UniProtKB/Swiss-Prot annotation:
This is Plastocyanin. It comes from Microcystis aeruginosa. Disulfide bonds: none annotated. GO terms for molecular function: metal ion binding. The gene is petE. GO terms for cellular component: plasma membrane-derived thylakoid membrane. Participates in electron transfer between P700 and the cytochrome b6-f complex in photosystem I.
Length: 15
């Protein structure tokens, strides 16, 4: 889930 960290920081935010 490293890509989610740069976008929002939460895996749930990745949609």
């Amino acid at each position: 889930e490293t890509f989610t960290v740069k976008m929002g920081g939460d895996a749930g935010t990745l949609q």
